[in-house]
Amino acid sequence: MAEVPITTSNQRSQVAINIANYLKDNKILKQRTGLLNNSEDVEFFRYKRLARALLSDDYKTKQANHKNGLIPIADEQEAAKVFITLIQSQFVIPVEKLHYNEIKQANKSWKPNKTKPTLKQSTKANIEPNAYFVWTYNKPNPFILLYSILLLVGIFTIILFPLWPNFMKIGVWYLSMGLLGLLGLFFLIAIIRLIIYIITLLVLPRAFWLYPNLFEDCGVLESFQPLYGWDEPKKSKKGKSSKSASKPETESSGAATGVKPAENAPTKRKVVLEEVDE
């Protein structure tokens, strides 16, 4: 294990930016999503995979094209030097991947997440194969210029509304009236379905819903499907207690009669979750 003292800087060289752009979404890194300090979603990877990407044939092919601005990398030592420049440019930061038992030891307020590993920022960068690092660099959006131009065009279009021809003004008026009509119809349906629900709740055993998925988290068409539905009755607690009470009775009856369960009968097993590192 080699601990390398590194001083970070806000100055970022163009070479470091080009290499970061190549590595950011590279499949060789096999990046995963983790929780930095148990709060922020980040992409993390192992150093050995980054070195593998820098020494790959794909990198050599793209490095041969001078437009990409990539420097030649011959061996692992040169790959380590390039990686150090990424740390100095604050494109990546070293982290520690915490196991379940280590999360509470690091911070009592942190809660383990079943789907995302918890990562803790480290003050030392260990240039070793299984060392973990997190991206703090985001590639520039190639469509940001197009979005900016469209935004300016939209602003000027609204400002110059008095200069629009009459047919465009009439078209916008009809369009706005149509949208307001749809919005009013939506609120009318919501009020009617609420009134129907309250009436059927007081009169019928089960309440009636018009468009039961209207406010559910689904698509526009799915919100109006099905047309109607009935409110599901709540399960009584007595049924649960009777089921739980029947289990010991069956067990005791088996002990009293002396009948043993079949050997091939399915038995419940405890599920043990084990964290496996890649």
Curated annotation (Swiss-Prot):
Location in or out of the cell: Endoplasmic reticulum membrane
Quaternary structure, from the entry: Part of a complex that contains SEC61, SEC62, SEC63, SEC66 and SEC72.
GO cellular component: Sec62/Sec63 complex; translocon complex
Gene: SEC62
Entries under InterPro entries matching the protein: Sec62, Sec62_asco
Lumenal side: 164-178
GO terms of biological process kind: post-translational protein targeting to membrane, translocation
Membrane topology per record: Multi-pass membrane protein
Superkingdom, taxonomy of origin: Eukaryota
Primary subcellular site in the record, as a coarse category: endoplasmic reticulum
Matching PANTHER family: TRANSLOCATION PROTEIN SEC62
Transmembrane residue ranges: 143-163, 179-199
Keywords: Endoplasmic reticulum, Membrane, Protein transport, Translocation, Transmembrane, Transmembrane helix, Transport
Chain intervals for the UniProt region annotation (Disordered): 230-278
GO molecular function terms attached to this record: protein transmembrane transporter activity
Family named by the database record: Belongs to the SEC62 family.
Known role: Required for preprotein translocation.
Protein name: Translocation protein SEC62
Signal peptide range: none
Cytoplasmic side: 1-142, 200-278
